[in-house]
Amino acid sequence: LSVGNGPEDITFDKEGNLYTALASGDILKLIFDNNAFISPTIIANTGGRPLGLKFNADGNLIVADAIKGLLEVTLMGDVNTLVDNYAAEPLRFVDHLVIDQSGVIYFSDASTRFTIENYKYDFIEASQTGRVFAYDPSLDSLTLLVDDVFFANGVALSKDERFLLINETGKARILRYDLHGGAGEGATVFVDNLPGLPDNLVWGTDGIIWVALIALRDPLLDGLAEKTLLRTLLGGLPHSWLPEGKHYGLVLGLDEDGRVLHNLQTADGYTQITTAISRNKKLYLGSLHQDHVGVVDIKNLQ
């Protein structure tokens, strides 16, 4: 499905129409008609870099914008800011979100040190300043749930809404945060030592947790934590010179206990996958730099 550069996340409305957001700031709608998607139309532009997006109960899009913060976007094109700071400090890298049945929005802020324009430095520095928040629109209240995360990325709610899954990209693992636990309990490890760097994750209606891995792990980046001098040297390089994981297409399907059910890979097809959403026996894929939404038939997966 051709859409334009960087369809990082994907969501659907009740009629089955597809929505995505691009590097240009555009939010697109692809109408589903006669078993096919019609060419996209622009419904809004955030003026930033929209990443995650989900519909709320009012039929508006809640958007995690890396530059502008947490936004509410109407289908008429109005863009309203919900959250753009915490403790009087701007949110630098709002990344992904999920909404519970009561309307509370859980969202990630990847780093307090770096923005989307220079995010690679976060992996070099290993600042581990990512956070996850809960925002209640009915009370206009913002609560910090988890901090000290090495690049907080995708978030997903369990089906019973008792816990939250958080992709910790910099450590190639998934965290679990108990929403009904005692104060100060923090997050625990749900899945460790993933083969790539996890971006978004979605708990699908099929009961499978679909995890998109944007790149394979880089041995150089894996070993930087103990190499202070090398980190310092790399930190002085232009951003475009910094290493990044090998471009590869990789999506994992996990069960509720974190066991791998499906392992979908391609070395030269749709790569740098940022999200994977299952719908009607198909897997819809988003990417940071591709110019189209990928579609994979999964009806024959066992």
Regions found by a protein language model. Name each.
Residues L1-Q302:
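Sequence-structural signature of mature extracellular/luminal beta-sheet repeat domains
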